[in-house]
Amino acid sequence: MTSSLRFLMRSNGRKRPNVTRPAKAKQPAARRNATLNRPWKLVSLSHPHTDRLGQVIGRALRGGETIALYGPLGAGKTALVRGIAQGLGASPMTVTSPTFVVIHEYDQGRLPLAHIDLYRIRTARELESTGLIEYFSGQTVTAIEWADRGLAALPQDRIDITLSHRAARSRTIQVRATGPKSHETLARLRRQYRRTGRAHRVSSRRALNKEAPTRS
């Protein structure tokens, strides 16, 4: 009996089957792409909740991102930009809607922020006159309200955020990444948002415990 055959023999004399396990199937590329392209859906129950989301977005940014904001009047687009500014380290109190001047720039934070409002833009010539495309290079973070009025000029790799009314104070928010860089940003944003949510719940429980009456 050869040594190789003895290796395959059990102590009871039965041969051990020489089984080759199949390699684990990889997730199809189409399914991976579908997962990446699926929007991240949230519900904001209040203005502070929307502001907190904006702060997390600001902290997740690395520079050069374009954030396109969509939604009707009063949906919370400017409030979200205030949170982004605060997350970048700028004062949210200085952030106002640039409806009439089109562009506000903020450079007090760790990254420069360009806040753009295209509500009054009606033609391609008006869009070109804003100098919008000049902000899409370098480290400037660009947040664009009413981005649907300038789609032709927007970079293909960006973060799209759609806000819609849900009730009197609550909002439905959908966040979608449209390219490689924005996919990385969105993944980082979701991780930070989960951590922030856990920290917020812990701090809320601690506050409730402090307020709870002591039993005698």
Model-derived segments and spans:
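N-terminal pre-Walker A segment at the start of P-loop NTPase domains
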Residues: A34-L53
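Post-Walker A helix-loop "phosphate-sensing" segment adjacent to the P-loop in P-loop NTPases
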Residues: Q86-V95
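Conserved nucleotide-sensing/catalytic segment adjacent to the nucleotide-binding pocket
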Residues: T99, I103-A143
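Hydrophobic anchor at the beta1->P-loop junction of P-loop NTPases
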Residues: I67-L69
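Short phosphate-coordinating micro-motif centered on Lys-Gly-acidic
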Residues: T2-R16, R21-R32, W40, R122, ...
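Conserved lysine of the Walker
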Residues: K77
